[in-house]
Amino acid sequence: MKYELSQSISQRGIGEKDAENQRIAEIADELRRRSQVYEAKSGAGQEHVSHFDAEQRSAELYAKEKGMWIPMDEVFDLGLPGASGNENDIYTREDTVFKVNNLLNSGSIVNLLEKVILHNSIFPDTFYYFIGFAGYDRRSVMPVLQQDLVKDAQPATPIEIETYMAAIGFTKKNYEGRFANNMYEVWDLVPRNVLKDKDGDIYVVDAEIKRL
């Protein structure tokens, strides 16, 4: 495989997490810039290219330049397939979970990366690292994220989720699994996305987030 998986799995401290958030932001900025250039060049010709397609091709080229491209036939090398959701295919290796994201909820790579940064700020215990992009040449490109595995976990109950979110300063809204404070709105906090370990600690492993 062309990407450095062993390095991505190594232990990281708070300073390294700050650096990772900065790296993700820089990747998002670069993809935004490249997509605009790609669209402009395509617009000068006869073939119209959508923003989504421009972003996809820009991400593929960027990943191949940076050694972050994961061919789809190598995705199973990430780990053992696990229970997948609407947006993520899950692979587990030792203490690590890899998520191959199909962008169903976020709609674009840049949107997803920006959401990852927000998640990392609000829920640092389930910090996401960006590994690279998986896909077939000139077809769908999917970001690959890494998260620590929550061991011996079970789904948290709605009451446990509400109690946890209140403890970190969020108020429950009118809809189930939706919370907000004066900076962020977080939703889809349902039991499948929030886990409780054997010590009773709560972990938000997946959430939809927007800045207010």
Where do the PLM segments sit?
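Juxta-kinase regulatory segment immediately upstream of eukaryotic protein kinase catalytic domains
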Residues: 1-76
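C-terminal effector/catalytic modules and regulatory tails appended to multi-domain proteins
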Residues: 3-4, 11, 15, 41-43, ...
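ATP-binding glycine-rich loop module of kinase domains
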Residues: 45-50, 73-125
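Catalytic micro-motifs at enzyme active sites that drive phosphoryl/nucleotidyl and oxygen chemistry
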Residues: 76-81, 87, 131-136, 176-183, ...
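Short hydrophobic-acidic sequence motifs that mark active-site Asp/Glu residues
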Residues: 87, 97-99, 144-146, 186, ...
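Catalytic activation segment of kinase domains across protein kinase-like and atypical kinase folds
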Residues: 102, 178-212
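Conserved structural core of kinase catalytic domains
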Residues: 102-104, 120-176
